[in-house]
């Protein structure tokens, strides 16, 4: 199976039952989602009526927010149980989201074969650090993007600070995430991400860091990318 880590998939399969529990295993994503959604919507100049691809959509937290904003959303993931939960949750909330169990590489091949319309916006949030070949994902995201489209990538910097906050802090001390959710050696430095994006003929227009206050349980953005960060990219 191309560019899939079965151990990584099994982690998320095991946590799937609590995907939509705001106080469960995915509490950090529920807390982060309004910030990242607003950033994406603003930088994409609105989402209404736009064709959007959410790569690594999991249980559909971001996909649903974008669909509620009027986007025509396709969500893809290689997990089974989280995708079923995503489909059911969308139905319960009266949302039309096209969920598919596929890799972005295979979706790219199918789109090319069918000469299908490309996407105005592609998002790949907190997924690159969970796949064997991040460059392959980025290249396929670029191939599925319209010439004037916008790609959003988010991941975690490979720094001591990120290790202390994301692994030790979030997984072991605050217990906001199950232990073993992240592997430090898979974290991605911004320079590495930018090199891959350059190889995929993508230009970074902006990069911002996510930051979290555990006392207020609030996230905010600034220019410090030493931990979690998001990049906005366009085709060269």
Curated annotation (Swiss-Prot):
<dbReference type="InterPro" id="IPR010233">
    <property type="entry name" value="UbiG_MeTrfase"/>
</dbReference>
<feature type="binding site">
    <location>
        <position position="56"/>
    </location>
    <ligand>
        <name>S-adenosyl-L-methionine</name>
    </ligand>
</feature>
<comment type="pathway">
    <text>Cofactor biosynthesis; ubiquinone biosynthesis.</text>
</comment>
<dbReference type="GO" id="GO:0010420">
    <property type="term" value="F:polyprenyldihydroxybenzoate methyltransferase activity"/>
</dbReference>
<keyword id="KW-0489">Methyltransferase</keyword>
<dbReference type="Pfam" id="PF13489">
    <property type="entry name" value="Methyltransf_23"/>
</dbReference>
<feature type="binding site">
    <location>
        <position position="77"/>
    </location>
    <ligand>
        <name>S-adenosyl-L-methionine</name>
    </ligand>
</feature>
<dbReference type="GO" id="GO:0032259">
    <property type="term" value="P:methylation"/>
</dbReference>
<feature type="binding site">
    <location>
        <position position="36"/>
    </location>
    <ligand>
        <name>S-adenosyl-L-methionine</name>
    </ligand>
</feature>
<protein>
    <recommendedName>
        <fullName>Ubiquinone biosynthesis O-methyltransferase</fullName>
        <ecNumber>2.1.1.222</ecNumber>
        <ecNumber>2.1.1.64</ecNumber>
    </recommendedName>
</protein>
<keyword id="KW-0831">Ubiquinone biosynthesis</keyword>
<dbReference type="GO" id="GO:0102208">
    <property type="term" value="F:2-polyprenyl-6-hydroxyphenol methylase activity"/>
</dbReference>
<keyword id="KW-0949">S-adenosyl-L-methionine</keyword>
<keyword id="KW-0808">Transferase</keyword>
<comment type="function">
    <text>O-methyltransferase that catalyzes the 2 O-methylation steps in the ubiquinone biosynthetic pathway.</text>
</comment>
<feature type="binding site">
    <location>
        <position position="125"/>
    </location>
    <ligand>
        <name>S-adenosyl-L-methionine</name>
    </ligand>
</feature>
<dbReference type="InterPro" id="IPR029063">
    <property type="entry name" value="SAM-dependent_MTases_sf"/>
</dbReference>
<comment type="similarity">
    <text>Belongs to the methyltransferase superfamily. UbiG/COQ3 family.</text>
</comment>
<dbReference type="GO" id="GO:0061542">
    <property type="term" value="F:3-demethylubiquinol 3-O-methyltransferase activity"/>
</dbReference>
